[in-house]
Regions:
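PLD/PLD-like phosphodiesterase catalytic module centered on the HKD motif
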Residues: 2-357
Length: 357
């Protein structure tokens, strides 16, 4: 009887814990309003250990961790998403094929968004996770979803942005995901979705895309604690990537941009407000150092001011035909860390470096 009661109490505590965890979690498992992660190539340091830099709402500088499956924050999101608790909805998208052992699994059509992420919500809270890592999370042919990073995770640099939101805000994000036309790789099972659920969630699950939108959208999304995140969204019909024009016009400053560089980066822009490609980076006092050929992340930082951006899109001409988001927000300390990581970048002839504005 005592053992039975103990099991019942444990189950209740577990259910209560899971119901609270529809928010971003840091490496220690504590709730945070948002976080940004830079995952470094495994060969970028002498030790050759897969590592990452972590920054959240309470940080004053990047904190560095060696990767472990149990504590890596994005793994925590996937793990509690796939827990037995059914009082929530979830949706995973990835433009790259996610099925590890299925040769018929294909990458998304070019009309689909170049985007990767997860959206999870219960009746009160939600989590938006945007990332750059192909085949994460990985789905096996038998339907099993792996919660650890795939084997390709240590080859290139990657980025992750997690935002804790209220459930109503997650519906706004779902509309934006429909707008950019994300690829439904890992679908919610429909018996988990209430028939009266929000229409944008239903459209995502059913892979129904509406083209009745403007070519671009600018939307301010508030985190659970009220921080503003500006989503710059583009349809695949808009033949301009937000890095080139939108960011510089919106914030009135030059920008550095760091993305996947293949087949080649789009040219730098040497107008009054410049756009410069970042070529080499170094983090943690040059412990992690690597060039553009080892980069798959998508981030940008203002040359002056405190604007930090994480995106779906690369600064390459091929991305002009793809939908996606660039998410920007203000944080002085993170902006300093991002600018401080830049070792070399494009240089406009006869102009001062952009960060000297």
């Amino acid at each position: 009887m005592q053992n039975t009661l103990r099991c019942v109490l444990l189950s209740l505590l577990l259910s209560f814990s899971l119901s609270l965890n529809r928010v971003c979690l840091n490496p220690e498992g504590n709730e945070v309003d948002w976080y940004a992660i830079f995952l470094y190539p495994q060969n970028s340091s002498k030790e050759g250990i897969l590592s990452y830099g972590y920054f959240d709402a309470s940080s004053t500088s990047l904190k560095y961790y060696a990767y472990t499956e149990e504590t890596f924050p994005p793994n925590r999101v996937t793990k509690y998403t796939l827990s037995p608790d059914t009082d929530y909805n979830f949706f995973f998208w990835n433009d790259d094929k996610t099925c590890k052992d299925d040769t018929e699994s294909k990458s998304a059509s070019s009309s689909k968004a170049h985007a990767k992420g997860e959206l999870i919500m219960d009746k009160d809270n939600g989590v938006f996770l945007q990332h750059s890592l192909p085949r994460f999370p990985t789905r096996m042919k038998n339907g099993e979803i792996l919660t650890e990073l795939p084997g390709n995770a240590g080859i290139y640099g990657q980025t992750f942005l997690c935002i804790s939101v209220e459930t109503q805000t997650s519906y706004e994000i779902a509309e934006l995901l429909n707008y950019i036309n994300v690829s439904n790789n890992l679908s919610v099972t429909k018996d988990r979705v209430n028939p009266t659920e929000n229409e944008w969630i239903r459209k995502l699950i059913d892979n129904k895309y509406s083209s009745k939108y403007p070519l671009t959208k600018e939307t301010v999304i508030k985190s659970k604690d009220g921080k503003d995140f500006t989503f710059f969204s583009k349809s695949h019909r808009q033949k301009d990537v937000p890095y080139d024009t939108t960011l510089r016009q919106k914030y009135g400053t030059s920008f550095f941009v760091r993305t996947w560089s293949r087949p080649s980066l789009s040219p730098m822009i040497c107008e009054d407000k410049q756009l410069l490609n970042v070529l080499d980076v170094a983090f943690d006092n040059k412990k992690f150092t690597y060039g553009k050929d080892k980069e798959h992340s998508k981030w940008a930082v203002s040359a002056s001011g405190n604007i930090c951006c994480f995106g779906d899109l690369n600064h390459t001409d091929s991305q002009k035909n793809r939908g996606g988001h660039i998410v920007c927000f203000e944080n002085e300390n993170l902006a300093k860390e991002m600018r401080g990581a830049i070792v070399t970048s494009d240089l406009c002839p006869n102009k001062f470096l952009a960060f000297m504005e």
